[in-house]
Amino acid sequence: MPLKLTRRQYAEMFGPTVGDRVRLADTDLLVEVERDLIAEGGGYGNEIKFGGGKVIRDGMGQSPTARDADSLDLIITNALILDSRLGVIKADLGIKHGLIVGIGHGGNPGIQSGLGSTFVDPRTGKKNPMIVGAATEVIAGEGCIVTAGGIDTHIHFICPQQIEEAISSGITTMLGGGTGPATGTFATTCTPGAWNLRRMIEAAEAYPMNLGFLAKGNCGTPAPLREQVLAGAIGLKLHEDWGTTPAAIDVCLGVADEFDVQVAIHTDTLNEAGFVEATIRAFKGRTIHTFHSEGAGGGHAPDIIRVCGEPNVLPSSTNPTRPFTVNTIDEHLDMLMVCHHLDTKIPEDVAFAESRIRPETIAAEDCLHDLGAISIMSSDSQAMGRVGEVIIRTWQTAHKMKQQFGALAGGAHPAADNFRALRYLAKYTINPAIAQGIAHVVGSLEVGKLADLVLFKPALFGVKPELVLKGGFIAWANMGDPNASIPTPQPTFYRPQFGAAGRALTSTSLTFVSQAALDHGTFRDAGLARRLEPVKHCRRIGKRDMVLNDALPHIEVDPETYTVKADGRVLTCEPARELPMAQRYFLF
């Protein structure tokens, strides 16, 4: 006679199933399970679970005959998967050779039916059978949320310790520029020149993080830019502190089109070489990734935010303005003076700073995120941004917008707050991956991609991960006292794991470079251990390709009042006085 469980008992044992709702941390956001691939495959009662007296034992949920070649290397059981491409689904997740090979139902085909991946592996054209054997490790995903590792596309590589902060928050890919605590790096995300690029690519070997470097894009002639792409740069960065003139923009985009790399831009705050209209004309309809598109982080004052309505622009935010709060304005003035080498004793420097910090456009930025008109979130690490808070501030913004404007209608994901949750998740996972040409390997949990995964307990979602996997191997974890008799005694804090050590580190992390550099043989004798992965498909993309964030409103900014309108409607909201995912999580 089958055992009957209440819905609560089932959720406590095997995790939530279709129709169950899960709160994300202490926000007002609820996600509802849309599909249960385990139940669809083998039916309820056919789940597998590890532990004493549980299912994954020899001859039961574990095959006694499966050889290594046929078995998963790792299975995450009964996980709640949150992914902007896949939706909100319950499934087992199978990993082999560092890649996601199956999402569905795993176990022992000798005694279980309905096993295997729901999705085809693009490398084989087949669905993986998801066999658990003697070669298979297990992570219990029951009651956990699994997302793809986060991607931060706006990194000032000022110090290597940023990587520890970022991975502790759930970021697994960092893209940007710099050479350490140099004055140029404090302000601009550029690793200029072949020699500096080689040193940073060599340094990347030491860290459990996918890394890629932008070169300096401000140059009036193409030859110096070509040299940097051939040296391994994944893209070019135009920054106003180096002179972002229409001529420099035009040359830079021309080289990017030639080599299929992305261009990121921080536009001309002072409007010295032209207004926002001149910059948009210089784009000539070519793809470009605009950093801190609201303008507090830099850009044409007061109306750079207009670019969020251009079809060729991939707009991103940086996290200090996310979300708009009662403290945002005061904090930004001090940050800006430091980061851009300004002097409080020089009136022109003070005026420059004040021109960039506008409550009206920051409030509109909240609204544009909720509309899906700003597609990407990033940090601007140590240069007016916090590298460990991309994920937190994304979800704080989503919470604030639900509080102020209510539920967000979404046709494909109408249940609970699924549509809003997936829209905001896309801003730090799949959309930055698409923008920077790395979506073929990271950015989602789709079968065939690198197994860069983050596991959260729902109460700690977006704030403090339990585990961070790089290339299918645990690299970082919330770990207790190493001298304790069990893993959990306090103090628990983030510690590097075996995936962050030795050759396991270089086997499970990627360094992104240009295809041109690989074709040119730039790294043939470089002695690098990490896999070099080329960026691709950077140029013929646009806002239409931004997952769940492809809105193209016509945006206007009043030059006197800074009021922002989208399609004729004023965009504004009140600053938050209280936020979730804040002090209650960081008392110690």
UniProtKB/Swiss-Prot annotation:
Q: Which GO terms describe its biological process?
A: urea catabolic process
Q: Where on the chain is N6-carboxylysine found, per UniProt?
A: 237
Pathway given for this chain reads: Nitrogen metabolism; urea degradation; CO(2) and NH(3) from urea (urease route): step 1/1
Q: Where in the cell is it found?
A: Cytoplasm
InterPro entries referenced in this protein's UniProt entry, alphabetically: Amidohydro-rel, Metal-dep_hydrolase_composite, Metal_Hydrolase, Rhodanese-like_dom, Urease_alpha_N_dom, Urease_alpha_subunit, Urease_AS, Urease_asu
How the cofactor binds, per note?
Answer: Binds 2 nickel ions per subunit.
SUPFAM superfamilies, alphabetically?
Answer: Composite domain of metallo-dependent hydrolases, Metallo-dependent hydrolases
- Give the UniProt keywords, A-Z: Cytoplasm, Hydrolase, Metal-binding, Nickel
Q: Which residues bind substrate?
A: 239
Note the Gene3D superfamilies from the entry. Metal-dependent hydrolases (3.20.20.140), Urease, subunit C, domain 1 (2.30.40.10)
Q: Which residues cross the membrane?
A: none
Which cofactor does the UniProt annotation name?
A: Ni cation
Limits of the Urease domain = 149-588
Q: PROSITE patterns under this entry?
A: UREASE_1 (PS01120), UREASE_2 (PS00145), UREASE_3 (PS51368)
- One Pfam entry for this protein is Amidohydro_1
In the UniProt entry, which residues are flagged as the active site?
340
Q: How is it modified after translation?
A: Carboxylation allows a single lysine to coordinate two nickel ions.
Which reaction is recorded as catalysed by this protein? urea + 2 H2O + H(+) = hydrogencarbonate + 2 NH4(+)
Indicate the quaternary assembly: Heterotrimer of UreA (gamma), UreB (beta) and UreC (alpha) subunits. Three heterotrimers associate to form the active enzyme.
Q: Which family does it belong to?
A: Belongs to the metallo-dependent hydrolases superfamily. Urease alpha subunit family.
Please give the name of this protein. Answer: Urease subunit alpha
Q: Which organism is it from?
A: Opitutus terrae (strain DSM 11246 / JCM 15787 / PB90-1)
- This protein's encoding gene: ureC
